[in-house]
Amino acid sequence: MSDQTFDAPVWHHGKALRKGYTTGSCATAAAKVAALMVMRQHLIHQVSIVTPSGVTLCLNVESPHVEGQQAVAAIRKDGGDDVDATHGMLIFARVTLNDSGEISLQGGEGIGTVTRKGIGLPTGSPAINRTPRHTIETAVREAIGPTRGAQVEIFAPEGVLRAQKTYNARLGILGGISIIGTTGIVTPMSEESWKRSLSLELEIKRAAGLERVVLVPGNHGERFVREQMGIDPQMVVTMSNFVGYMIEEAVRLGFRQIVLIGHPGKLIKIAAGIFHTHSHIADARMETLVAHLALLGAPLPLLTLVSECDTTEAAMEHIDAWGYQRLYNHLAERICQRVLEMLRFTQQPPTCDAVLFSFDNQVLGSSRPLAAIARELTC
């Protein structure tokens, strides 16, 4: 995404909608400017960062303060016209220099704490996701140089109150908000406009002559395909939660092969015949896992443990501990079966494959041998 693309509005029903930036971008900018102030020993009132999507943001700094080896600064969250629970709040960073040579990151007031497994962060750690952790540490390192150390604290005085309007508590994130954002940019878009934009990408791929397409829920899937399967990123299209819609569009456009690749947290819903995977439509993840574990002869204690889990990752720990890893191949096959059932009235349906991977990019299961799927996609 270029800077010009960021400045351009998103149009919906004739109305121009303004883009915004994530809590991760706010935390990164606040940490960067605090580090610069403590190095230069004077106040700074504007800072620029480059987001993971390549957009340069120039942001106003609020409440800057520097004293000795410590500085504090804040950035106000702006979600554009996609107003959420964190819109308008201040995200602070406090940077304290030291001689350790290392950069340590911690969450302070108003930043949630991870209390359950299953969201890709260690239990007891602050709810600062992987991409913001990386961008914060990189920005501070650039500011302080290669040899100094720093302690970075991210905090949000309104965080406890704002978090009550989010799903954090249901995910086991307690005491505040999460610092998130894979791209650093918030793009406002209605569901229909969003679906149409995804379909347009399919049309572009097909017009370029592609007959095989990989559908992924989001950025994590794109990285897995690129890094673990060696597949050309040009073959990958994001389907978001709109699995059924994107499959139907791929059929309409004449793709001969569809490969669904993603984390079980999204894709196992398809095994239950759920083709819109947003949680406000349907969930049934634990019910699906329990049903298919039972089909494989899993004992009641394991079924009970899985049924009581809040996240797929937590359930997977029990599944792996009990030695039922074969469930993942079984689910991948079931996903393909469900897709073909959905397309049963299509005259020449495409072939379908499914691949499931973990948060740490390990292959969990596939409908066919992974090498065979990858080979077909690269030929």
Swiss-Prot record:
<dbReference type="InterPro" id="IPR002748">
    <property type="entry name" value="CbiD"/>
</dbReference>
<comment type="similarity">
    <text>Belongs to the CbiD family.</text>
</comment>
<keyword id="KW-0169">Cobalamin biosynthesis</keyword>
<dbReference type="InterPro" id="IPR036074">
    <property type="entry name" value="CbiD_sf"/>
</dbReference>
<keyword id="KW-0489">Methyltransferase</keyword>
<protein>
    <recommendedName>
        <fullName>Cobalt-precorrin-5B C(1)-methyltransferase</fullName>
        <ecNumber>2.1.1.195</ecNumber>
    </recommendedName>
</protein>
<keyword id="KW-0808">Transferase</keyword>
<dbReference type="GO" id="GO:0019251">
    <property type="term" value="P:anaerobic cobalamin biosynthetic process"/>
</dbReference>
<dbReference type="Pfam" id="PF01888">
    <property type="entry name" value="CbiD"/>
</dbReference>
<comment type="pathway">
    <text>Cofactor biosynthesis; adenosylcobalamin biosynthesis; cob(II)yrinate a,c-diamide from sirohydrochlorin (anaerobic route): step 6/10.</text>
</comment>
<dbReference type="GO" id="GO:0043780">
    <property type="term" value="F:cobalt-precorrin-5B C1-methyltransferase activity"/>
</dbReference>
<keyword id="KW-0949">S-adenosyl-L-methionine</keyword>
<dbReference type="GO" id="GO:0032259">
    <property type="term" value="P:methylation"/>
</dbReference>
